[in-house]
Amino acid sequence: MRMAMSCGGRLVQRLDFSSSEEEDGLSNRINEAPQKGSPVSSWRTNNCPFPITPQRNERGLSPTQELSPSSDYSPDPSDKGVGGECPGTPLHYSTWKKLKLCDTPYTPKSLLYKTLPSPGSRVHCRGQRLLRFVAGTGAETEDPTLVNVNPFTPQSYRQTHFQPNGKRKERPEDDCSSDSQMKFTDKEHPAVFQSKRFVLRETNMESRYKTEFLEIEKIGAGEFGSVFKCVKRLDGCFYVIKRSKKPLAGSTDEQLALREVYAHAVLGHHPHVVRYYSAWAEDDHMIIQNEYCNGGSLQDLIMENNKKGQFVPEQELKEILLQVSMGLKYIHGSGLVHMDIKPSNIFICRKQTEVGEDESDGEDDVASASVLYKIGDLGHVTSILNPQVEEGDSRFLANEILQEDYRQLPKADIFALGLTIALAAGAAPLPCNEDGWHHIRKGNLPHIPQPLTPAFLALLKLLVHPDPATRPPATSLAKNSVLRRCVGKAAELQKQLNVEKFKTAMLERELQAAKLAQDECLDLPPVSGFSCRGRKRLVGAKNARSLSFTCGGY
């Protein structure tokens, strides 16, 4: 690439740039002989050892206008150096070598160099980011210590795990600047974290629900919102997605929606509690990802039986009562109360077990051991020690809760469980108020059309006793002999099996000891001409034997 620089309408010097010898070509052309009559020739005749540039920016020109071909600025002939010989001041060779000619096109090598980022610069990705983090409100950005405080977390757990231990893990200096926010001082440790004010307004990102899940069908709707059966695109498994009907941010229902998330997070995983996986907010709506129960709810089973004129058998009623009481035992043991036990909040999980035709014993395809009953919908959960009661369905509400007597909150779940089993047994729908409602609160069960054993019927009456102190706790129900009879036979068989296994092990040990003794006897040399076989004697070998014959008919 060749370029001519003109000064005052005359050709001063030809420049030739190459992509591989940019600097060498520049230094070689400086020493080339200029044309006659050019200013460069006069510089050489005046014994000026280096090319001299005019005084720069004397007229206040910007750096982009100095010596620009498009500029109308021309050196003033009256501007002279010392003695009028050299117009300007001489530059050192190294400075001249680094001089950047203004408005000169870049060479391919220089353009490539300018495209490379500097070591200290940050590269901004123009494409779509796979992980997009959206900052919250200004208040949350300024104070990174704002987090949600779970009200159901035990106080002892907070004191044990939220206190700083004095050990601080330092991060390398080359980490991202955002990581520095993870370091907190003694005044900012999680024990003093404050709760966020606008929890549901911080995720304005692309819909996670549409990105991660494929909606199959709508399986229910309630006070909270709609419930959908979905498949997660990543693992291909079924999940239940609950989405609130209306925006909850800033409303009175926000804390009610968060209560279910808090309760699920504290309870963790239990075989008789619907499993919780995740929760997030989209467009001010709360979304909860839970376990999918393929058997529906107990309410669905009751409605199906009513259409067919059937009832849940007593053995299955005992199994439902036993499993739900085990779930309540776990919830109450965690310091929480459900406060909304009813058939629509008890879900059924059926294990998919394949039974061959030859192995079928004529019983139902699904045995009691292959069905799990789980407690779900924790939207009304509250703490036993610090109750903030939100009344559930009035049909299952205990009288002491209506009177705001919260001294024995877990017994309210027992009362609702007794009425739930009565409905599963075939009782008519429960009244919401008036005389029928008060009749049940006096300890009377609704009419059950199917016959039940006296022991089981007495247990159900005990569950709805008007005195909450008389009702059995969940721990006692889980061990009740009336409920354990359905599994007592299996326990007895298991005990007998263990005894037989022990006997078999003892016999095998004796057999091995006998074989070992026989092998040792065979390995010993014979003593006094006798062998081990000579020691055996046949009793009665030389004695006379009596013979008797019996002939029929004689």
Swiss-Prot record:
Question: Which residues hold Mg(2+)?
Answer: N345, D377
Does the keyword Magnesium feature in the UniProt annotation? yes
Q: Where is the active site?
A: D340
Query: What are this entry's molecular-function GO terms?
Result: ATP binding; magnesium ion binding; non-membrane spanning protein tyrosine kinase activity; protein tyrosine kinase activity
Coiled-coil region(s) at which residues?
490-516
List the catalysed reactions.
L-tyrosyl-[protein] + ATP = O-phospho-L-tyrosyl-[protein] + ADP + H(+)
- Annotated EC: 2.7.10.2
Annotated GO biological processes are: meiotic cell cycle; mitotic cell cycle; regulation of meiosis I
Q: Please give the name of this protein.
A: Wee1-like protein kinase 2-B
